[in-house]
């Protein structure tokens, strides 16, 4: 059973219609799109994570199939790692594209997976809740998840902050953690357009305290972006956009197509 915990007192939350509440009478309304905000009180009222422009860009880009090879690999890995009725967390779920694929893959095994999507961006979680109405979605930080200890069979962590201690706390003994990270040459051609001195991503460090690495899978391919809209969407959905000055951002304005390297690593862990 996947139980949410109150971010104020830590007691179990119960849902009644459109409100989650605990026995200490702390209550949290469910938004019209289906998610609940469970950020700690100290973080309430602040804007966190991806903004609506970044979320819209990622939604548009992924809807065009450019990363379908990765989405398929994630879904296949989840089918191998989790049972049909597993309790699963998509930690840093974003707008829900991968979450949708994860749910469908597990449901295809004939069960009813309990899937929680958590992200610190309310804009992202809003879209995710609409994409996957079968799941539970909350605005939350992965540094302090509103979940009981040892409550999950599988954690999926895609391009999001990796919180080893917290993930270890909420994962069951014998459970699995699937982590997806970009490799060194990921999007190097995009960087070459924008930067005078394009740089590779740092090598992935597989060690994770409290976990043992079970297996890895590298996905390397090239994609051809067929319009300036897609080029801009890819750039906007990455962290590079907000780290890049206005003049360098303008360099993409004339690029109508671009062949880009994608390099991903899927790493599977179990609690040590």
Language-model features: locations:
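Class I SAM-dependent methyltransferase Rossmann-like catalytic core
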Residues: 50-73, 77
């Amino acid at each position: 059973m996947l139980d949410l915990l109150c971010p104020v007192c830590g007691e179990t939350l119960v849902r009644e219609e459109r409100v989650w509440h605990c026995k200490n009478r702390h209550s949290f309304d469910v938004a019209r799109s289906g998610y609940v905000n469970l950020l700690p009180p100290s973080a309430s009222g602040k804007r966190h994570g991806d903004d609506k422009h970044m979320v819209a860009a990622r939604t548009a880009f992924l809807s065009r199939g450019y990363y379908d090879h990765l989405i398929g690999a994630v879904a296949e890995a989840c089918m191998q790692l989790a049972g049909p009725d597993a309790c699963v967390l998509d930690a840093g779920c974003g707008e829900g594209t991968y979450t949708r694929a994860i749910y469908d893959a597990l449901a295809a095994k004939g069960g009813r997976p309990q899937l929680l999507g958590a992200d610190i961006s309310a804009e992202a979680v809003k879209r995710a809740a609409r994409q996957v109405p079968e799941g539970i979605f909350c605005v939350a930080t992965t540094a302090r998840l509103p979940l009981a200890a040892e409550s999950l069979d599988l954690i999926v962590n895609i391009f999001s902050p990796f919180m080893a201690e917290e993930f270890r706390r909420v994962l069951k003994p014998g459970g699995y953690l699937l982590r997806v990270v970009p490799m060194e040459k990921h999007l190097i051609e995009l960087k070459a357009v924008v930067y005078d001195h394009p740089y590779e991503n740092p090598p992935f460090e597989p060690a994770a305290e409290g976990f043992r690495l079970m297996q890895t899978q590298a996905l390397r391919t090239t994609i051809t972006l067929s319009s300036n809209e897609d080029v801009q969407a890819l750039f906007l959905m990455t962290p590079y956009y907000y780290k890049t000055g206005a003049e360098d951002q303008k360099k993409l304005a004339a690029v109508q197509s671009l062949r880009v390297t994608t390099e991903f690593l899927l790493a599977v862990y179990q609690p040590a």
